[in-house]
Amino acid sequence: MATVSIPANTTALLLDIEGTTTPITFVKDILFPYIKDHLEEHLSAHWEEDECKQDVHLLKKQVEEDLRLNRACAQHALDQSGHTDEEKAIREVVDNVLWQMASDRKTTALKQLQGHMWRAAYAAGRIKGEVYQDVVPSIRRWRRQGLKVYIYSSGSVEAQKLLFGYSVEGDVLDLFDGHFDTNIGAKVESKSYERIAERMGCLSEEIMFLTDITREAKAAEDAGVNVAVVVRPGNMELTEEERSHYNLITTFSQLEVMGRV
């Protein structure tokens, strides 16, 4: 694919993670299986600790919310109180978490527990954050050219920092000027990008957003943000209309800043 120009008025690049900086398989084949394989072990080891108790409390509150709203819920009781029934209580939590993951839910309770487990795994060297080989050199080049670089992902800010803090390239957190997650809004809503621009202290048209998801690209465009769609192995296939509408890149090295060396 040809070189794609970053408009000369751009002050910041906003990067998606999954399918953009990082193989889409990393979450599906590494992060999520780690939770499934080590969940019961994690709960058993930390059951009496405050952080684990808070995680379970949030899961229980989510169940109560689901019941109140008549949502389907595989597990209607999460009881952490009885020491004699600890094994049963842990099993209930495991069943609930696995059900949420199978249902592709994104609840705060689930993301918090996952984040705590991944934090321990990264710190212990069990997991290293994957990034494409073109990512770090390109970001370094953009920063030398005076651009700021931010992350916007559906994964929590903590999860983002773990991935880049314990990456295969080492700790590269210093390459980023800030992180955004869905606390600022959904990635498919244009208002989210307006809020991000406000938080950055710049105009929407001074931002370029890189993502592999065209619904996100459209939302960003609707907010006045410039967009390039990233085509990586395993990413969702694009329609002919999408291919003709968007600037496409297969590597960050294709992006060139107009008027800067």
Curated annotation (Swiss-Prot):
Its EC number is 3.1.3.77. Substrate binds at S153, S154, K187. Pfam families: Hydrolase (PF00702). Mg(2+) binds at D16, E18, D212. GO terms for cellular component: cytoplasm; nucleus. The keyword Coiled coil does not apply. Signal peptide: none annotated. It comes from the Eukaryota. Its main location: cytoplasm. InterPro entries: Enolase-ppase_E1, ENOPH1_eukaryotes, HAD-like_sf, HAD-SF_hydro_IA, HAD_sf. Pathway: Amino-acid biosynthesis; L-methionine biosynthesis via salvage pathway; L-methionine from S-methyl-5-thio-alpha-D-ribose 1-phosphate: step 3/6; Amino-acid biosynthesis; L-methionine biosynthesis via salvage pathway; L-methionine from S-methyl-5-thio-alpha-D-ribose 1-phosphate: step 4/6. Keywords: Amino-acid biosynthesis, Cytoplasm, Hydrolase, Magnesium, Metal-binding, Methionine biosynthesis, Nucleus. NCBIfam families: enolase-ppase, HAD-SF-IA-v1. Monomer. This is Enolase-phosphatase E1. It comes from Salmo salar (Atlantic salmon). The lineage of its organism: Eukaryota, Metazoa, Chordata, Craniata, Vertebrata.
